[in-house]
Amino acid sequence: MDESALLDLLECPVCLERLDASAKVLPCQHTFCKRCLLGIVGSRNELRCPECRTLVGSGVDELPSNILLVRLLDGIKQRPWKPGPGGGGSTTCTNVLRAQGSTVVNCGSKDLQSPQCGQQPRVQAWSPPVRGIPQLPCAKALYNYEGKEPGDLKFSKGDIIILRRQVDENWYHGEVNGVHGFFPTNFVQIIKPLPQPPPQCKALYDFEVKDKEADKDCLPFAKDDVLTVIRRVDENWAEGMLADKIGIFPISYVEFNSAAKQLIEWDKPPVPGVDTAECPSATAAQSSSASKHSDTKKNTRKRHSFTSLTMANKSSQASQNRHSMEISPPVLISSSNPTAAARISELSGLSCSAPSQVHISTTGLIVTPPPSSPVTTGPSFTFPTDVPYQAALGTMNPPLPPPPLLATTVLASTPSGATAAAVAAAAAAVAAGVGPRPAVGSTEQIAHLRPQTRPSVYVAIYPYTPRKEDELELRKGEMFLVFERCQDGWYKGTSMHTSKIGVFPGNYVAPVTRAVTNASQAKVPMSTAGQASRGVTMVSPSTAGGPAQKPQGNGVAGNPSVVPTAVVSAAHIQTSPQAKVLLHMTGQMTVNQARNAVRTVAAHNQERPTAAVTPIQVQNAACIGPASVGLPHHSLASQPLPPMVGPAAHIAAVNINRTSVPLACAAGASSLASPNMTTAALETEPSGRTVTILPGLPTSPESAASACGNSSAVKPDKDSKKEKKGLLKLLSGASTKRKPRVSPPASPTLDVELGSGEVPLQGAVGPELPLGGVHGRVGSCPTDGDGPVAAGTAALAQDAFHRKTSSLDSAVPIAPPPRQACSSLGPVMNEARPVVCERHRVVVSYPPQSEAELELKEGDIVFVHKKREDGWFKGTLQRNGKTGLFPGSFVENI
């Protein structure tokens, strides 16, 4: 081993300065310079090994010197270097290695002929420089550049440009003939790159230590502080230095520069059962999949990397590969702060992809998705080592300059190397046999478009009781942040409610994706089907408007331009073979009716936040008709829709009085007073009536009439056809402005019996906003891909019960074997609890901390249907019809 390589190893792991004879060795056999040890004792009043955190009982002066280090240093000083055959012995290679600053001094033309000097990697690391090129970091111009904006550096082809700093992967700041300015990266070839900055990180959040005695190993810092990264301790913690203090800190609280990312990736402990080959390199240069030539180092830093943190007085020979004089390997300890470790989830893709930023607060955990597209970069020009330099220059044309500096600015909080693709789950429009169905990929196909190492949000669709200590308890509707998907079907993640970290079966949860919708497309949220393609599609709220379509033929509407989306609740995701269809009511109603409709909302039996998305307001909605349907993922293939079959329910009137049942349907196209709610206007006389709706019994299209807005008398005679047609005139939605109706489910036939004084209407249904004291949802979605199903009931009553069939809480899966793929799911029917609502007024505004929470404004009226033990309420906001969680201290009972 020559002198240069040996001296690179003899540096302090803390300050990265060269060790000398005054360095001390600790009882754990780790060696550090005396200055660093004295600084640790002065700041913390105790001495712990920065590598393994072992407490040292003796003082710094009492520690022994490293005998091996002293002998190595003495041997280097006393070893004479033989001059080369051409003379020049007065200049030794040691002088080269001790050169300070960014300038590297050559041994001279005679010394370069020396065998000893010729073996030095620092001198021979690059090909012999062209004559006249300074030994500073420099580049050679490939083309003429005239400059596009003031401050740009103008140069001609062949000019040698001295590099001062790298602004981002597209721009450099350099100097030519004493003139400074900016120039694009793809106009030059880097001959000698800039020295890599030290491994540092920038604090994204404040990290405070409450119990200083218990958390004395932690390194507190404030937002925007710059820390020097020393090493990675475990999966969630790293060790660093701030000023003269050394300690550990959570990885998810900081953003690393390129050098620190490489260091963290090197120190990352191996995870059994996880394919680490899917994680790309930490450097952004490898994303171009070009040559591995050293010139690609120019792309290792983004604009938001900490290039300004480069130490100007740092020697260019300072290697980033830190090595300590350790005889035994350091002991990797777990977090000394279990409370803090439980709150911080691991972001395993820190250097691999764009992780979601996790904002931890006292009220919830918000997951902010990464940017949808990376920064546009210009083409990079790299040359293989076997291609002659002049030949490569002659075969290239001038490239297009990259975007200007201001156009490519990236926020500092954006993770480096953000390459997350924007996944848009387009929905299929329900058409009466007209037009093909747009192709939509399944959840698994969509998941492959995103980086596999990015933490994903999942929702529990079945409860699971842990059997081992490292397993998590799953409660239906609970949100989880998954950051590892093991090969045996188990997931590792953290609960967004309890912040506990553990493993759980993968087929008990479903991914939550956000679909991007437009007003010009049909909005149909994808339901779940099977176990391999489960998922919840959360549709972003937007204004859905457009002209209504006129009916075709027997009152069946044509292909509408807008199909409003339904509310997708995480607590009602159906993964059985018959996936449930979620609908919400459409039509017009008065303000009082809208308020009354909100008073009774289905109370779902879960204790933790669920993913709820507000429905989208519909302009020119139909009087009565299905608002939206859920499609199984596998049924969203690129194939045409089957033609309409007609109403999807057979209505049998039982014990109906001979009094008339007026049904008021406003045909106008005005929006509701409630901005995010659409319901059907229903008025009925109080009388004892019982109507049974039998979904699954198909009826002919001729049974759909085209009358709406008038009152009709239903008489219980033996002519059932006349009765059915009389009701279907009002219930089929066959008006001048309506949505198309879809085919009935294949199986099974489900009955919903409604109490006295109720008139359920097929077609006027809603998943969260029924009109009376009853919320009945029936029907299932077939898995044979024959189209979605619209079926359900809603009625006017104050004292009734709530029953759901084929809903999520009635399906109990079979417990999975230990650490193996879970078995199939067996549905079991069950009944829910009746709905109890209380009116509350908001006294203090509350901003939501997650999508499962409600935004409260002072003076709002909230209908509370559940009060939890932890002080949180679940209710529906009267202002917009949203259902969610909120702290009970922000409202008062009225």
Swiss-Prot record:
GO terms for biological process: negative regulation of apoptotic process; negative regulation of extrinsic apoptotic signaling pathway; neuron migration; positive regulation of JNK cascade; positive regulation of proteasomal ubiquitin-dependent protein catabolic process; protein autoubiquitination; protein ubiquitination; regulation of CD4-positive, alpha-beta T cell differentiation. Phosphorylated at Ser-305 by AKT1 and AKT2. When phosphorylated, it has reduced ability to bind Rac. Residues 306-322, 700-713 have a biased composition (Polar residues). GO terms for cellular component: cytosol; Golgi apparatus; lamellipodium; perinuclear region of cytoplasm. It catalyses: S-ubiquitinyl-[E2 ubiquitin-conjugating enzyme]-L-cysteine + [acceptor protein]-L-lysine = [E2 ubiquitin-conjugating enzyme]-L-cysteine + N(6)-ubiquitinyl-[acceptor protein]-L-lysine. Residues 293-363 are annotated as: Interaction with RAC1. Pathway: Protein modification; protein ubiquitination. Its EC number is 2.3.2.27. Residues 134-193, 196-259, 453-514, 835-894 form the SH3 domain. Belongs to the SH3RF family. This is E3 ubiquitin-protein ligase SH3RF1.
